[in-house]
Amino acid sequence: CFNGKTVKYIPVHYVMSRYPKYGLNYYQCRPAALINNQFMPYPYYAKPVAVKPHAQIPQWQALPDINPPTVPCRRRPHPSFLAIPPXKDQNKTVIPIINTIATXEPTLIPTTEPIVNTVVTTEASSEFITSTPETTTVQVTSPVV
């Protein structure tokens, strides 16, 4: 059963020598305990100094558990962030680039002209009957000088 009032203090060097997978980790996990716990022997924090009336209030300073490493540890990036260039195939044939610009073609302009029927029937008067205009396409080319 876990007793919340007492926290066991295990030296860092014991953990690092006992479990080699923790040997490369310079920052071990610290137990969750209150700083004001009367049963904790202050392994991680310095005790406060007596305060004079006009002096500044000192802050608690974190003490290092082990000697800091001389070389800063470099994290390896996750493989999903690495940019791997695609492999080039030597047997691949080169496809020539085709010019897709179209040549000049004559422009078709639709024109509308009314068509007049001149058919005269016996019952109708001699008026001209105009039907609805029909669209026809006429090819227009520029004159050559």
Swiss-Prot record:
Q: According to the UniProt record, list the residues that bear Phosphoserine.
A: S125, S142
GO cellular component annotations of the record: extracellular space
Q: Which GO terms describe its biological process?
A: lactation; protein stabilization
- Where Phosphothreonine occurs, the residues are T121
Q: Which residues carry attached sugars according to the database record?
A: N91, T107, T112, T118, S125, T141
Subcellular location(s): the record lists: Secreted
Entry comment describing in which tissues the protein is expressed = Mammary gland specific. Secreted in milk.
Q: Which InterPro entries does the UniProt entry name for this protein? A: Casein_kappa
Q: Which UniProt keywords apply?
A: Glycoprotein, Milk protein, Phosphoprotein, Secreted
Task: Quote the PANTHER family the UniProt record gives.
Answer: KAPPA CASEIN (PTHR11470), KAPPA-CASEIN (PTHR11470:SF2)
**What function is annotated for this protein?**
Kappa-casein stabilizes micelle formation, preventing casein precipitation in milk.
Q: Which family does it belong to?
A: Belongs to the kappa-casein family.
Q: What is this protein called?
A: Kappa-casein
Organism from which the protein derives: Hippopotamus amphibius
